[in-house]
C-alpha cells in the first residue's frame, strides 16, 4: 500500500503541505476563498524545532490501534488506508488517545479528522505531496519487512 513518507532532511518547515491539505479537503475550488481569514484544519502538520522539521500524518498502520479504540465504528480500513465514516463519529476522542503518533485530531465540527491520503479527491497523490516545493514528502509503496524467527526460538 502506498503511504506518505516524510524526509526531514528536505523539509523547510514552510507549512505549505498544511495549506494544500486544508484546501484539498475544503470542498472549494478557489484557494483564497477556502483559506483566507479562516483557521485551517489540516490533516497533516509540521512538527519540529530550529534544528529539524518534518511533516506528521497518519501512518495507516497495518494493525491500527485507533480502529480498535473507536467505540462507534467510525474508523475502518479501506484498501489498506484507515478511513473515517464521519456520520458515525461521536467525537469521543478515544482514537486520538490511542494513536501512538498523534496523527488524529479533533476537527472544527467536533468529529475527528486525519489523513485519508486524498483518496476521495481523485488527484492521484495526496495534495500535501503534490504541493511540497522541496519534495520533502513522498507517496510511495515500500516493501513490508519480513518477519523472521528469532534465533534460539523453540519449535515443535
What residues fall within each predicted segment?
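Conserved C2H2 zinc-finger inter-finger linkers
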Residues: 77-78, 108
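Extreme N-terminal starter segment of soluble prokaryotic enzymes
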Residues: 1-3
Amino acid at each position: 500500500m502506498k503511504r506518505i513518507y516524510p524526509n526531514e532532511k528536505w523539509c523547510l518547515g514552510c507549512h505549505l503541505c498544511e495549506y494544500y491539505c486544508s484546501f484539498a479537503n475544503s470542498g472549494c475550488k478557489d484557494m483564497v476563498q477556502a483559506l483566507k481569514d479562516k483557521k485551517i484544519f489540516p490533516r497533516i502538520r509540521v512538527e519540529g524545532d530550529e534544528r529539524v522539521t518534518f511533516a506528521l500524518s497518519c501512518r495507516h498502520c497495518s494493525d491500527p490501534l485507533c480502529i480498535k479504540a473507536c467505540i462507534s465504528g467510525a474508523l475502518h480500513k479501506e484498501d489498506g488506508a484507515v478511513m473515517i465514516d464521519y456520520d458515525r463519529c461521536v467525537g469521543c476522542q478515544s482514537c486520538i488517545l490511542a494513536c501512538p503518533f498523534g496523527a488524529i485530531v479533533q476537527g472544527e465540527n467536533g468529529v475527528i479528522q486525519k489523513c485519508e491520503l486524498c483518496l476521495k479527491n481523485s488527484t492521484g497523490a495526496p495534495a500535501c505531496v503534490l504541493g511540497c516545493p522541496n519534495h520533502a514528502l513522498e507517496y510511495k509503496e515500500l516493501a513490508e519487512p519480513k518477519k523472521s524467527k528469532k534465533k534460539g526460538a523453540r519449535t515443535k
